[in-house]
């Protein structure tokens, strides 16, 4: 285990005023600095939460990169970017690293507006190679000579976009370095043929030695030695795939180097220099790292320490989440799906490298033949599900709202046009908190409700989520169920659920105004209405639309013709979202007759990082925010 922060005898980091200062350090100083970085990262993440295991695994690689390249000139692009904590500490942000992932603090990902050394923003996987190739082409067009380096993990390399980038880079032959950070993990354990390919015969030094010894021995044979050795070399090219993972990348016309010990700074620097010296084709340097390196709990269970909240350093146990808290929406989803699968063997579950995050690990354990983790391949996941649905199965695609964006064409082309009964379970819909703009589930209502043939359902609590899963089983067409990150509201879960009706529900009667809300905003709206009745004697009605597409039209039209003050609330982008759909319905049915209509939702700009509570307060997506808006609406003109 790494030393606690207060036991670091000598601070090297405090003397790093410029990233290039690392090039002046001795090897021993770099090793000391690596320990210092580990201690700071562990301490900070234990307080703030964050992506611990990925960042601990690349500290030596980060130091070697900065010892070899000049980030003021060379372009270094980190794929996904959740492993860049050491990078941030070494590129001028050590003084405010304690603000990591906090409101108005440092982002947990590369961000071009945060530092000149963050050359390309990230958050989603597999973008680095394509972006780096674009930068390499721009460099060549301008006649410049700097290096462009993409650092990508083996998890990201399961994504099709990474191979599209490799394919184009090889065809173009641009001078480009790709560093493959191979820790045999993405978030969940890596899957697919590529993972098996990379993990085969990693320690290949003996292979090289044996090959050279055999070749030397063959050459020593009198008369025919050279001829036999040449034949053996040709045969070796055919057999190379047995021993060499690099053959895959060489097929893409990359010069393959490695694998290299990713925690041996000296060795990494040597091989990075070798890669930098090759100027006639792209290069891939294969680096082997250990996720969670230096913190024993993270080394033993890297998936649990991939991304986590605040925790106790000594035990590794999370600090929050009281045992008395309601179950999370994710947990309710996973448990309910397993209950249904016990009764209906048509149910299959698909996730994209997020089994633990989407709550499907339990399903995987109980029904392994009906579970598929496709890796970071959202496009494939959706069309794979469509194929299953076409053969009579009931596929549930468990995916974060933000990652569903990556499969938009497949949702339309392969599922909705054919009206196949695929259920999209959109976890983390709405504001997710500290991961920021790349991870908020802000757009799913907007990009889904314009598609024909798909229904969209947003349960208001964990009991309704349970019912929504039951509803999906009775559906014979596409369905999306969206639900937020975090704990439920604390309602009792029934032992047996029934499908939800195709209508909304009036939860509270009133006459001064009505709140029409959806999903996660229904219960805050109800609380706000109750409080205003007690505090201000205001009579506020509350309607849970429940369905976004199709809307409960007759109910909404009746409400529009009844109330003069209407507040529409959603945890989604206002542009094209639920409230837009309701106002369109009112306009199309001549229901607009001078009412005051206000909307609360996510405005038309990208929401930065901060806690869910803080961000929702800023956006009025809270009980107090709703009360404030209602009081403004009800003021006399």
UniProtKB/Swiss-Prot annotation:
Q: Which domain of life is it from?
A: Bacteria
- Cofactor descriptive note: Binds 1 Mg(2+) ion per subunit.
Record-stated family: Belongs to the transketolase family. DXPS subfamily.
Q: Which positions bind Mg(2+)?
A: 154, 183
Natural source organism = Lawsonia intracellularis (strain PHE/MN1-00)
Q: Please list the reactions this protein catalyses.
A: D-glyceraldehyde 3-phosphate + pyruvate + H(+) = 1-deoxy-D-xylulose 5-phosphate + CO2
Q: Which Gene Ontology BP annotations are present?
A: 1-deoxy-D-xylulose 5-phosphate biosynthetic process; isopentenyl diphosphate biosynthetic process, methylerythritol 4-phosphate pathway; terpenoid biosynthetic process; thiamine biosynthetic process
Tell me the route in metabolism or biology where this protein functions: Metabolic intermediate biosynthesis; 1-deoxy-D-xylulose 5-phosphate biosynthesis; 1-deoxy-D-xylulose 5-phosphate from D-glyceraldehyde 3-phosphate and pyruvate: step 1/1
Question: Which gene is annotated as encoding this protein in its UniProt record?
Answer: dxs
UniProt cross-references to SMART domains, sorted A to Z: Transket_pyr
Per its UniProt record, what HAMAP family does this chain match?
Answer: DXP_synth (MF_00315)
Q: Its quaternary structure?
A: Homodimer.
Is the keyword Heme assigned to this protein? Answer: no
For this entry, the protein name equals 1-deoxy-D-xylulose-5-phosphate synthase
Pfam families from the xrefs? DXP_synthase_N, Transket_pyr, Transketolase_C
Keyword annotations from UniProtKB, A to Z? Isoprene biosynthesis, Magnesium, Metal-binding, Thiamine biosynthesis, Thiamine pyrophosphate, Transferase
Sites where the protein binds thiamine diphosphate: 82, 123-125, 155-156, 183, 295, 378
What cofactor(s) does the depicted protein rely on?
Answer: Mg(2+); thiamine diphosphate
Single GO MF annotation: thiamine pyrophosphate binding
- The EC code for this enzyme is 2.2.1.7
- General function of this protein: Catalyzes the acyloin condensation reaction between C atoms 2 and 3 of pyruvate and glyceraldehyde 3-phosphate to yield 1-deoxy-D-xylulose-5-phosphate (DXP).
Name the GO cellular-component terms.
cytosol
């Amino acid at each position: 285990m790494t030393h606690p922060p207060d036991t670091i005898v000598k601070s090297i980091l405090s003397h790093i005023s410029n990233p290039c200062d690392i090039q002046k350090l001795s090897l021993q100083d770099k090793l000391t600095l690596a320990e210092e970085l580990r201690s700071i990262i562990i301490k900070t993440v234990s307080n703030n939460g964050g992506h611990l295991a990925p960042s601990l695994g690349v500290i030596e690689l980060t130091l070697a990169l900065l010892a070899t390249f000049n980030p003021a000139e060379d372009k270094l692009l980190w794929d996904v970017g959740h492993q860049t904590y050491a990078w941030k500490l070494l590129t001028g942000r050590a003084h405010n690293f304690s603000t990591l992932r906090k409101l108005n603090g440092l982002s947990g990902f590369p961000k071009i507006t945060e530092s000149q050394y963050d050359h390309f923003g990230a958050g989603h996987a597999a973008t680095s190679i394509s972006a780096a190739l674009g930068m390499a082409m721009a460099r060549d067009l301008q006649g410049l000579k700097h290096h462009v380096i993409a650092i990508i993990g083996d998890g990201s390399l399961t994504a099709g976009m990474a191979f599209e980038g490799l394919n184009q880079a090889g065809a173009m032959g641009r001078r480009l370095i790709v560093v493959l950070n191979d820790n045999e993990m993405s978030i969940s354990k890596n899957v697919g043929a590529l993972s098996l390919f990379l993990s085969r015969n990693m320690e290949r030094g003996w292979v090289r030695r044996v090959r050279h010894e055999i070749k030397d021995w063959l050459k020593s044979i009198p008369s025919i030695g050279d001829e036999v050795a040449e034949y053996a070399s040709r045969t070796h090219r055919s057999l190379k795939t047995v021993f060499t993972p690099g053959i895959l990348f060489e097929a893409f016309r990359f010069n393959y180097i490695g694998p290299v010990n990713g925690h041996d700074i000296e060795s990494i620097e040597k091989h990075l220099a070798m890669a930098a010296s090759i100027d006639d084709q792209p290069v891939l340097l294969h680096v082997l790292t250990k996720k969670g390196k230096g913190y024993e709990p993270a080394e033993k269970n890297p998936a649990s320490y991939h991304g986590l909240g605040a925790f106790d350093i000594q035990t590794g146990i999370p600090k929050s989440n009281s045992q008395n808290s309601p179950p999370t929406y994710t947990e309710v989803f996973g448990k309910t799906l397993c209950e249904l699968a016990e009764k209906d063997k048509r149910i299959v579950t698909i996730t994209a490298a997020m089994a633990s995050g989407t709550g499907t690990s339990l399903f995987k354990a109980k029904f392994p033949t009906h579970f598929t983790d496709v890796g970071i391949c959202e496009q494939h996941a959706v069309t794979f599900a469509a194929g299953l649905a076409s053969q009579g199965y009931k596929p549930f695609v468990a995916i974060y709202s933000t990652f569903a964006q990556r499969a938009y064409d497949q949702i339309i082309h392969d599922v909705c046009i054919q009206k196949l009964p695929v259920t999209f379970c959109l976890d983390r819909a709405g504001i997710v908190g500290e991961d920021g703009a790349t991870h908020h589930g802000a757009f799913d209502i907007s990009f889904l409700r314009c598609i024909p043939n798909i229904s969209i359902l947003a349960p208001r609590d964990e009991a309704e989520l349970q019912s929504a899963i039951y509803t999906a089983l009775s559906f014979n067409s596409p369905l999306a169920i969206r639900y937020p990150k975090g704990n439920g509201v604390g309602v009792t879960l029934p032992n047996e659920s029934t499908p939800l009706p195709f209508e909304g529900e009036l939860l509270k009667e009133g006459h001064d105004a009505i709140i029409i809300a959806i999903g996660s905003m229904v219960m805050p709206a109800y609380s706000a209405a109750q409080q205003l009745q007690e505090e201000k004697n205001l009579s506020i009605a509350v309607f849970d639309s429940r369905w976004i597409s199709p809307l409960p039209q007759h109910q909404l039209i009746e409400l529009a013709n009844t109330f003069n003050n209407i507040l529409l609330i959603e945890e989604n982008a206002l542009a094209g979202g639920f409230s837009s759909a309701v106002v369109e319905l009112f306009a199309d049915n001549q229901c607009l007759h001078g009412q005051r209509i206000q909307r609360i939702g996510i405005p038309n700009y990208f929401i930065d990082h901060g806690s869910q509570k803080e961000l929702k307060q800023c956006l009025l997506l809270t009980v107090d925010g709703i009360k404030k808006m209602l009081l403004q609406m009800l003021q006399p003109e």
